Amino acid sequence: MPRERGGGGCWLLPALLLLPPLCAPALAISVAAEDAKEQIERLVSQESEKSGKSNKINIELQEIVFVIQSQSNSFHSKRAEDLERNILKQAEELGKELPRVLLIHQMDRHDGAWTILPLMHDFSASYGRNSSWIFFCEEDTRIQIVKLLETLRRFDKSKEWFLGKALYDEESTIIHHYAFAENPTVFKFPDFAAGWALSIPLVNKLANKLKSEPLKSDFTIDLKHEKGNGPHLTPVPEFCTDDLNSYKAVHCATMFSNFLPVCGDPVKKEDIFVAVKTCQKFHRDRIPIVKQTWESEAALVEYYSDYAETSIPTIDLGVPNTERGHCGKTFAILERFLNQSSSKTPWLVIVDDDTLISIFRLRKLLSCYDPNEPVFLGERYGYGLGTGGYSYITGGGGMVFSREAIQKLLASKCQCYSNDAPDDMVLGMCFSGLGIPITHCPLFHQARPMDYPKDYLAHQIPISFHKHWNINPVKEYFTWLAPKMEDSFTEKKQRRIREDL
């Protein structure tokens, strides 16, 4: 598949199948026990008055299988387990039989389980006869169980339903392979943060279809945009991404707040080493943008090129520039970090020369990760996941490595098959072979702000964007990523400013 050539050496993969989720920032897992109990009792009472059949809740609760799109990294697995406990606690407060709750990362027999489709056969075989709904949610999705039951009751469970909060592209975009170019707004796809549901008849149909028609695309780029010939998404207003404390939340079955996680003090500036991939032909137009925007946020930054220029300065790694891939350059950066940087520097970030990034926010995010674990963090894509492939971090949005991950990688002797091999994909293949899962964070972005639905970005505090073409990159940086935004505006004001641009 052709890949669009990126700046300092990364590529943007045009999508045939189109990513999901998840790093998932901080959100309180539960309300105080007494408040939660009172709220549930009130909702149950209201529901009983409406239907006159209190037993209906029991039956329907047992018919829902909750699937949390979790990850195996210790930070994420704990968040998913907290959500699982919250779901079960709500069910227990109702005094009913506990529902089934599944965590994606525990389904380790499926390397591509996060893409959901490989699990359809198992869902159909295990739950096709005794369940009505598969409900998917992210680690930070918050669920009002009674309200969810009330919402699903509106839909005939014997029919094929695909339910969620609808997103759409206002303009055709490369991350969705310019799908529906004439009018991209016609295709609606779910915001995973709000949760989404498939009725069992649709699950069974998909399982049968995938048996006879295996996935045709090698690449998984934006899972929430994947599409087929089945039922279109039915928008459900009760599936929300409003904050728990919002006045709108009272009407919501689900809520979500993707605030930046704070797990302690932000990591120190000196704990992050930033490597910028560039080449001589971009020294004059791209490097000045870096210096006008995020460079001052980084205490340790070096520019790696095919030409040493003291005025920047750039470092020639002895790897010739290539027209595609840049794997040789990336592995040379990894070697240099391990052998020449201070052994006390726990984190390495590799970005392209046209990546816009907030080091300020990254420092907060990394407070949630243990640098003693092998961490490989960024925006997740997939290659050949239906046929034994692997996941990888797409380079344009930034690739974050713990020192431990780099040590294990280089000790394995896994390497580029050529200097111009796609670096991000080779890294994904190497880490997969080592049994080290990549960690996905939706706050890293391979494309520009305009390439994502406004409503999707509205519940994010982004860490990076990529590409300078057809935008003013300095303006985009100060609109979306500059540190002063946290100091000057509330999240609500940020959202209003962004929507007005």
Positions of PLM-derived features:
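Secretory-pathway lumenal glyco-enzymes, predominantly type II signal-anchor Golgi glycosyltransferases
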Residues: 2-501
